[in-house]
């Protein structure tokens, strides 16, 4: 069985085939391995890994020198996520992962604007890094301890 990492890497390569010379896309192999250790639908694993990849890619775009191409690639990755989400056709999961995206963006904004207490910064970063897989796994696995 092909890993979620390998499947997504192939899909991204196909999506970006017409984009000349772009920075490498980092896919979180460890997250893929965690997702692959659970019996959840492949498209749910791909959706989770894709939104993680898109968000990390956009986070890596330098703030002072926003590359139009880097932003375009982030947008293409986000569009790929929404395509997978539509194919999955699970409105309940769609609502949960969409709410997770909103929460992650709000937390990132709070950090950026120094609105998080120093005592809460570690917890906030852990939430940002782990929320997508937690939402995905908890949605599909009834008795999971995350």
Q: What does each model-found stretch correspond to?
A:
Residues 4-146:
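Mg2+-dependent prenyl diphosphate-binding active-site environment of isoprenoid biosynthetic enzymes
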């Amino acid at each position: 069985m092909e890993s979620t990492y390998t499947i997504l890497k192939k899909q991204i390569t196909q999506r970006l085939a017409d984009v000349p010379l772009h920075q490498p896309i980092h896919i979180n192999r460890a997250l893929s391995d965690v997702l692959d250790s659970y019996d959840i639908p492949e498209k749910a694993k791909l959706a989770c890994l894709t939104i993680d990849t898109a968000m990390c890619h956009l986070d890596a775009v330098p703030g002072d020198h926003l590359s139009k191409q880097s932003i375009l690639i982030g947008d293409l990755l986000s569009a790929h996520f929404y395509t997978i989400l539509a194919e999955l056709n699970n409105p309940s999961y769609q609502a949960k992962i969409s709410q997770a995206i909103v929460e992650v963006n709000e937390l990132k904004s709070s950090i950026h604007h120094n609105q998080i207490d120093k005592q809460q910064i570690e917890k906030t970063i852990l939430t940002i890094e782990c929320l997508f897989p937690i939402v995905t796994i908890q949605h599909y696995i009834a008795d999971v301890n995350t």
